[in-house]
Amino acid sequence: MHSRYRDGALLLAAFLLAYLLPLGFHGLWIPDETRYAQISQEMLHSGNWIAPHFMGLRYFEKPPAGYWLIALGQAVFGENLFGVRIASAISTGLSVLLAYLLAGKIWSDPRKSFASALLFMSFGFVAGQAGYSNLDPQFTLWTNLTLVAFWYAVHSIDRARLVAWTVVGVACGMGFMTKGFLAWALPAIITLPYMLWQRRLTELLRFGPLAVVIAIAVCLPWALAVHQQEPDYWRYFFWHEHIRRFAGDNAQHAQPWWFYLPLLIAACLPWALLLPVTFKQAWQRKSRPDTAFLLLWLVLPLAFLSLSKGKLPTYILPCLLPLALLMADALVEHLNQGRGRALRVNGIVNAALTFLGLLALIYVQLKQPVYENEPMHLLLAVIVLTGWTLTNALQGIRPLTFWALPAVGSWLLIVLLPAALPNDVVYNKTPDQFVARHQAELAACTHLLSNDLGAASALSWRLKRPDITLFNTWGELEYGLGYPDVQGRQVRLQGIDAWVTKARSEGRVGVIMRGKSDEELRELELLPKDGQR
């Protein structure tokens, strides 16, 4: 029991220091963070919790539950950087807890429970998303909860089994309310083959309908309400966000079928070189129900997502919890047997590559500086690379003693990296910091204009105003701009002179422009030259 308290305290400390502490110390990244911050803020201010709007325009790409939780964070902690990101951090923290609980349920081995949670929360991809405001950490939580509850359900009896199936239904419902039908597809393609293999299909047919009914009950009130408020919602959401993205020739974010294979390796850094021993042991134990379930959970969603034409890196987040458990199982078995070779190789290779990265940074900085008069940023970058090198080197030198140290390097990375980035990156990717520096002047403007959706949403969130006029840009807002009741929210090139003249006659005009591409420079040239810049 003492070791469990110690392990829990260590994981909680890591959560507080690595996940929560950095949330409020760097600007919102475009396009995701500014988008989700603004949509959820608009829900808070407008009171419309049914149909999502992005800068006052209909935005039907996702259901509202993810926005609700981000809005809750802003309501409780303030409309600030911490409030925008807290939902992602807590969602990831709860997924870490689920990894710990599932490992305990499967193996009843405190060391494997701790290793499962530690590996999962130090996977670079998981840790990075914990401090990033988007919907994937929330969706991953609901998917993880669905499958963990399923495992509890099929290993329980009587009332405990009914409670577990109820949790399956609630989690499926909330997953659907966060990202749509994928929340039902992923559990189905895992649980059905597993129960068939276990020859327990009758049990699934007996209790599965309970979860289905509860999931529908969770979703139905909102589904009916949004249909009444926005009759076109379901057509757009189903066909555009599901069918076209999955199978359309012009699918958004199109990638080749093998896209997720190298990404899976990168996602589990700094533990990637443990994958060979992980898969070797998993294959040897594939006839065991627990290993088979975890393999199905890892492989089948990965295959399903690979079939989709549209792919984003964060889609594989639900595959990482079972990978962490399989890896923890192999790692602890190696530790128990005194076999440190895989850990030694992992540590040495990580340390060597990071040290080479440190040398490359120094060389580039001397030849063609990446950091221009930014000694603190450069120092932090050196600290990050040095810390990663040392923690992994110690694992390589004494793998059986310092096996967990790469996790410290991973957490150091996510704490310091945002503050270690060059100003060129920060200014380009976090425009809300520029808006914050000029907030007083911009807040006094009657009209606001931008040629970039990321900058526009940052401006909208900082000033708590959805009425930003979009100059020659539309992108993901093309659908929302097509409604007749929002005409005038967009200005094309040929109409900018008339718009500026009219806007100036009504008060001050604030403009945030991006000027890197030839098209953007042309847009800048069309603006009046007599304005303050």
Curated annotation (Swiss-Prot):
Organism of this sequence: Pseudomonas savastanoi pv. phaseolicola (strain 1448A / Race 6)
Leading EC class: transferase
Pathway this chain belongs to: Lipopolysaccharide metabolism; 4-amino-4-deoxy-beta-L-arabinose-lipid A biosynthesis
Primary location class: membrane
Membrane topology: Multi-pass membrane protein
Entry keywords, A to Z: Cell inner membrane, Cell membrane, Glycosyltransferase, Lipid A biosynthesis, Lipid biosynthesis, Lipid metabolism, Lipopolysaccharide biosynthesis, Membrane, Transferase, Transmembrane, Transmembrane helix
GO cellular component: plasma membrane
Protein name: Undecaprenyl phosphate-alpha-4-amino-4-deoxy-L-arabinose arabinosyl transferase
Cysteine disulfide links: none
Record GO terms (molecular function): 4-amino-4-deoxy-L-arabinose transferase activity; mannosyltransferase activity
Signal peptide bounds: none
Transmembrane parts of this sequence: 10-30, 64-84, 86-106, 113-133, 137-157, 170-190, 207-227, 257-277, 290-310, 312-332, 345-365, 377-397, 402-422
Pfam families reported for this sequence: PMT
Protein's job: Catalyzes the transfer of the L-Ara4N moiety of the glycolipid undecaprenyl phosphate-alpha-L-Ara4N to lipid A. The modified arabinose is attached to lipid A and is required for resistance to polymyxin and cationic antimicrobial peptides.
